[in-house]
């Protein structure tokens, strides 16, 4: 049976060789250094994440170890281990005595199980013992001010059993097997105070219109206001990739979001092709939104031209756009009479759920007879309400609303609403209308225009 440590080294070197063949770096030494630094960073990040979870659970992930013995093979063996948890095989009563574990092995006759090395998951848990000394403060292994056992010269022969100081040895512990993604913390209130400016690229009118159309239905940019969308489009950079070029690599950190202008891109997960995308499609959004590795490898199936948006610009524009939209809508909603019964918290949730739509003079916002799916609040501009039976009914302006009747009673639109000039409306879908408006729905029912002589006011 091969040595586990040797097998681990062999696997790592094999993986490194595959990476070198795949990416063909010019500077092999630097590539190898970056490769192992990235692996080390990921391992340490996971280790300290587990430590934080353990502390939150009241568990000492780094129990103190006074001495280690060295066996005849030169392997350090921990004596007097002080585990931070008790045997899972004992009585279920959490207050019972767990000191005796009938399944525990004699460490004197099974020293190999207690060997420490080759990673945090290869140490003996010694679950039969419970901690007798209080845990001491954790030590950062990277702190140069702290002594390390690795820096002590080996002054004893391999056959001697001597005691040497040892740094704290982490207990293998998985506080929570479920993993999650996260994003860097950015404080939107401080964004206005720094000097950061988004990049601006000189695009032709045709290019701007094409990119705006491509972004129109993208779920990340759909909620941005007009100014934020213009900022995104102006910041896009054109990148060209030859056929068979790896655009993004599965497992790498996300750096760019891409929109395909021309060509075809194939996507692979674990070397298996899963899909393809072509002109007008986009990819790479999630790795920019969240601090998580790329979920797939993207390879240019043909010569490809893409528009790319870098991570910092992506995060800043989205965050600022969302933050500014919330502030604007919260102020706007406070002035609408029918919404004054909402609490500040409910108003904030409603502000986050609203979407902005723009219409030009003559555009029909809703049409008589159509099925209603949205509720509308007029932010600016003027609208005319009319139907075939009564003709012009009334005009609506800033702060007015329409479309509620079709959602409350699940009826077709009772009238057409047309923009008299440039109009900006905030829209709320049917599910959000029922979920977020709460007591306001009852008020709207009381104001049901079908109860009056004007059956079209609710549209």
Swiss-Prot record:
Binding site for 3',5'-cyclic AMP 1: 220-335
Location of Phosphoserine modifications: 180
Dimerization and phosphorylation: annotated span: 30-219
Gene Ontology molecular functions: cAMP binding; cAMP-dependent protein kinase inhibitor activity; cAMP-dependent protein kinase regulator activity; identical protein binding; protein kinase A catalytic subunit binding
The entry's keywords: cAMP, cAMP-binding, Nucleotide-binding, Phosphoprotein, Repeat
GO biological process, one term: filamentous growth
Region annotation (Disordered) ranges: 78-109, 125-168
Gene Ontology CC, one term: cAMP-dependent protein kinase complex
Composition bias, Basic and acidic residues: 95-109
Matches recorded under InterPro entries: cAMP-dep_PK_reg_su-like, cAMP_dep_PK_reg_su, cAMP_dep_PK_reg_su_I/II_a/b, cNMP-bd_CS, cNMP-bd_dom, cNMP-bd_dom_sf, RmlC-like_jellyroll
Residue stretches of biased makeup (Low complexity): 146-168
One protein family per Pfam: cNMP_binding
Binding site for 3',5'-cyclic AMP 2: 338-454
Subunit structure: Tetramer, composed of 2 regulatory (R) and 2 catalytic (C) subunits. In the presence of cAMP it dissociates into 2 active monomeric C subunits and an R dimer.
Protein family (similarity comment): Belongs to the cAMP-dependent kinase regulatory chain family.
UniProt-recorded name of the protein: cAMP-dependent protein kinase regulatory subunit
Originating organism: Candida albicans (strain SC5314 / ATCC MYA-2876) (Yeast)
